[in-house]
Amino acid sequence: MNSADPSSTESISEPSFLDCWYLTGATASGKTGVGIELAQRLDAEIISLDSMALYREMDIGTAKPTAQERQCVPHHLLDVLSPRDEFSVSNYLEAARRMMIEIHSRGRQVLFVGGTPLYLKALLRGIFRGPPADWEFRRAVEEELKESGLPALYERLQQVDPLSAAKLHPHDKRRIIRALEVHRATGRPISHLQTQFEEGRPAESCHVFALLWPRAVLHQRINRRVDEMFAAGFVEEVRGLLQRHGTLSRTALQAVGYREVIAHLQGRADLATTIEAVKARTRQFARHQETWFRSLSECRFVPLQEGSSGQEVAQQILRAGSGVGR
């Protein structure tokens, strides 16, 4: 049996993941509004596809659906973790699988909405049964980084897994550490284990849609959203998190903007500089997301323009997906 086949019982991914609907896109692309419109037309419930929306108390910076929006359509996998909790892709897949089965038992469709590329790829293609996260090893590596720096860590990866090293940017700390972690636990390169999960299905056979704005328009939307976040109390949200929890988990700190606001609260940047830094990092993250989505053969882009309404976009997606599987 081929363990790379998402229909395989050996894969972490379930075959019915491939029958679900997916709405993704870069940050600030309007996924929440379109997702609600689409879910209502599909008689679907929404499972969040956002790694940071899992965390409680991190509402403004993650742009979670509001309470009013959640009343329109049931939403799942929101506010399920403490800001101090670590969470992996494997953890997400298991939680999503349970929720998907529960929703299907009610006779309803499942719509995943969010912009975390790793989660999307894992749902569509599965993941290899790699070792669980070794937080003790990761803490030791973080200490090592303080002394020798990231270049030394990257050089170590080049020695044990040159194929992975060639694919990764020398500054991609998180994935460099994960590759070393897998090699340490299994004695095998992560690149060897991952190759069987690289093939995707044609877009025409899937219900996977990504919202795509012209770059200049998306940047305007991002800048406007960041301004609104700070006006809504983003700094106060982060201050409260630090007061209640002391620190955030490594995975929670991956949320765009939180490190920048923490630096501001520590007196290392004024507010205006912080706002601009968050805008710049968010734009960078949006480019990263779109690069990922373009690499997935399952994904169909939905071009948008100023004036596009959520209702119109949802109807367009529904028409495009109506023939899938027939």
Where on the chain are the PLM-derived regions?
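Phosphate/pyrophosphate-binding catalytic cores of soluble transferases and nucleic-acid-acting enzymes
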Residues: 1-326
